[in-house]
Amino acid sequence: MASPEDLKSVIDKIHDSRIRYYRNENNCGAVNVVDNWNICLSYAQGDYVICMGDDDMLMPNCLEEYVKLFEKYPNLGVYHAWTELIDEFSNMFELQAPRQEWESVYSLIWNRWNGRLNQFIGDFCFDTKVLRQDGGFYKLPLAWGSDDISAVRAALKGGVANTQKVCFRYRVNSNTISNTGNNEIKIEAILQERTWYQELIAKVLDKPHNENDEFFFHCIKLSMPQYYAKKIRNTLADDIYQKPFHIFKWLLQTNRLGISKLQIVYCALLAFKKGVILKVR
């Protein structure tokens, strides 16, 4: 990493051969944060790799639960840890919805688009070889959607196995890219993500292997336009709230965005509503 903080002095106090500390010559920055993920991947020496934030936490049972899955479901490209969300003070305030112990890539996509509101790069454990064969973590600006696509690509190799016990803690704070970040860049990332899924659906997922996956595939195709329209609307609303005059810019880009002028006006109303609620609070 290339943190402005004096982390080396902290690391120098720790004498443990299992800990390896690297410092980038240049900071990758928020827009290109996936470059840093892939730099970290290049240093990985084990069979499996977890890319977690420095303020996230592996719970004491995390690796044990993963090993159980490795033994029961060998040769998968990705595994997932049931995760609780914590605040800046390490207080748990939300729990991910439970998942079945194994699911196909079709189920992973469908459930992510329909109810699994929270999912992060750190709660996935990847087979290092598979991840490298895929070209590393999938790069999108601000990593906006990179975690989902990286997991989906790995899950194409046999699905994903999920721990049945909570074993990972993801920290939410006001300074994360999710809560800051440039909304215009986020829109660009969403458009790139949408294009990637369109190609996946057309060229890769079009031959499901059983009735369940046929059902999921049908639902994925039907729900995709609405899913991305909503994702774009929410981001536009945040952008218009911060920069009201941007509404005119977005009104000129309806074809590229894939939403109507009326929907952009609706985004402006959402932005206005958000402003009113914040003022009341």
What are these regions, as identified by a protein language model?
Residues 24, 52-54:
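Catalytic metal- and UDP-sugar-binding loop of GT-A-like glycosyltransferases, i.e.
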Residues 61-95:
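Conserved donor NDP-sugar-binding/catalytic core segment of glycosyltransferases
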Residues 1, 54-57, 82:
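The conserved acidic donor/metal-binding loop of glycosyltransferases
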Residues 102-185, 189:
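Conserved nucleotide-sugar donor-binding catalytic segment
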Residues 49:
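Short aromatic/hydrophobic "clamp" motif used to bind/position activated sugar donors
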Residues 1-26:
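Acidic donor-binding segment of Leloir-type glycosyltransferases
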Residues 222-281:
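Membrane-interface aromatic/basic loop that binds lipid-linked glycans or pyrophosphate carriers
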Residues 25-44:
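Glycine-rich, basic loop-to-helix element that forms the pyrophosphate-binding segment
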